[in-house]
Amino acid sequence: MIYLDTSSLTKAYVSESGSDEVRQLLERTSESIYISSLSLVEFRCALARRTRALTLTDAESQRIWASFEGDVDDGVFDVLPVDNDDHINARRLIDAVAPLPLKALDALHLAIVRRARALLGTSFVTSDAQQAAAASALGISTQTIALKI
């Protein structure tokens, strides 16, 4: 299985550095593609941020969101819920990777990946350099695309 964090998920819908690579990965894989319910919120936020910054029009943002929702509804992505244990484990991961910097929501993604990996086996795809470093420190198989530092 492949787990996309929101930085990589966004590249599938918004043209930016690494978009072609993410799109090719999604087109070529025969594995299940997982995201978390956290990604639903983060992706909506990413579109709103781009609309405020005028890199997307409101119409473009709405079209992209509708396309994404359609893909979720059509089962392109399996959406993993975030549960209380993920929050507890995210707090533990912050300590486990110290002194590496790890943002709160990145820690939560990594906790979800670790839970999914234990159940399903997984590869983690991210475009966030700090999150990739933390994932590697935790022994999570990580693929990076157009890293943002």
Q: What role is predicted for each listed range?
A:
Residues 1, 115-149:
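Acidic, PIN/NYN-like endoribonuclease modules and their adjacent C-terminal/linker elements
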Residues 1-40, 50-63:
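Short, well-structured N-terminal submotif of metal-dependent ribonuclease cores
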Residues 17-20, 24, 52, 71-79, ...:
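Noncatalytic, solvent-exposed loop/strand surfaces
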Residues 32, 64-75, 132-140:
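Short, mixed-charge aromatic SLiMs
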Residues 42-44:
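Well-ordered alpha-helical segments within folded domains of soluble proteins
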Residues 49, 53-83:
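Helix-adjacent hinge/juxtasegments
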Residues 74-130:
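Active-site neighborhoods of divalent-metal-dependent phosphate/nucleic-acid chemistry enzymes
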